[in-house]
Structures are given as C-alpha cells and as structure tokens.
Amino acid sequence: KAMVGEGKPQYSGLMRTVSLLAALESGKVALTDTFDTKEGVCIIDGEILKDHNWHRGGYGKITALQGFEVTSNITTYKAVDKAFGENAQEYIDMLNKMSYKPEEIYSPQEEGWSNADFAWLSIGYNQLVYPLQMLTFYNAIANNGKMVKPIFNKGETEIINQQIASKANINNIQMAMEKFVTEGLGKLALSEKVKVAGGSGRSQISKDDEEIKEYVVMFCGYFPADKPKYSIIVSMNKMGLPASGSVMAGSVFREIVDCITEKESLHAIKE
C-alpha cells in the first residue's frame, strides 16, 4: 500500500539509495568498500560537493554502508564514480534497467556534460522526479525487487519490473536501510511498535543567490521491515536552515507508522 500525494517533480536527496543500489549492481562496489570523504569537502571540476558535517571536519575514511547511514554525499558520488566513472552513460543505463525513470534527467548525451554534473546527478540533482516515482522505487526494494504500479484502491496489480536488481543486492540495500534507522541518522524514524527501514534526503530547490533558501526534506521507507505491508514517503518544503530529512520528515514518518500500527492493533482486538 502507498500513502502519498502525487506532488510535483523535484530534486530528491532520496536518490542516494538508488545510486548505491546501482553501484552495487555494477559488481564493482561492495558495502564494505572504503571511501575517503576527507574533511567533508570534495572539489569536482571546480565545483564543491559537501557532506552535511563539513564544518565539523567531515567523516574521513568510511565504508559505503557507513556513508549511507550518515547520508554522505561524497561517499555516494565516489561509489558511483568507482562503478561508472569511466562511462557515465552506463550509470544512466543501469537506472533504466532498474526502471528508475525521472520525469526529466540531464545525461551524458547532453552538451556540456561534466564530472560535476555526474556528481550532482548521483545525489539527486540534475533530474526532476515525482515523489510517487521515488516511492515506487523504494516500494520495489520493500517488495524484494519487484516493482509494481502504485494502487490506491484494491485492484489488479500491474508489474512494471519483475526484478529491478539481484536478490543479493536487494538484500544488501534492505539491510542498509534498516541500519540507517537503527544505527544511523534516521533514528527519529525509529518506532517502538514495529521495525522500519528507510532513507532520507534534503535538496535545495531555490537558487543559490536567494538570501533565504528553500529546501525540500524527505523520508521514504516501509514497515514492518521484516515483512513489509506499507510504503510511505514524506516530503516537506522548508524555508531556511535548519532543514533535515532525517529529523523533520523522519519524525512525521514515525508518527504515521505508529498511527497505522495502533489502528491495526485496535482492529485486531475488535475482531
């Protein structure tokens, strides 16, 4: 089941999950691979990619899994670069193979493409995607790799992709999403009532020269993590900082999870 409004296409920090799965599928990256984020600042073709804690000195050397747990932009980019850096079109091809198809996407076929564009794409920029499209992808992960068309009422299920990635890598990304909630920055999404899994993100949707910047913060996940029944995406706009997908959208996600779980418990008691 899905609980979501269609919204509008936008940048999405939730892309980190998609990118990590694509990197794993390449066979060139493992969750145990180590990447050096240094002091949380990475310069690519003259453009600066930062992790959220760059002002505190960054994360240094961390694994791909640890990078996912702390929503590291640099780890995401370096994992994707290791997998597809020699041919960025292979990254786009992998996204298509996994049926991740944004409303708009800036690709290596476009004039002026650069390594910096590759980096921004890997973390959710240079594309416009509907929240419902992102939810559909996360739901496929919950569904052990089977992607289905979202339905809001009971009806026949339409399969989009029978298996978006190998079962081994689906298992890996499921584990990473669970750890994001239990051990990473997603702890505010942690429910005492049921096991959950998910990922969060933040994207700037206003121009750099605007005095007060606008952000979209997101959390997408599913529950129960060990036998999923529901997938949910929370997307919120926020003017100015602080703006955190893990804190703001993650808290709302947990409230929704607890509400549904309580209602199901009451329904079971009545029966």
Write out the residue ranges for each language-model feature.
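Beta-lactam-recognizing serine transpeptidase/beta-lactamase-like catalytic domain environment
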Residues: 1-12, 18-238, 266
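Amphipathic alpha-helical segments in well-structured domains
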Residues: 88, 249-250
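Short, gly/Ser/Thr-rich active-site loops of penicillin-recognizing serine hydrolases
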Residues: 158, 250-271
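A short acidic/glycine-rich loop-to-helix N-cap element
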Residues: 238-248
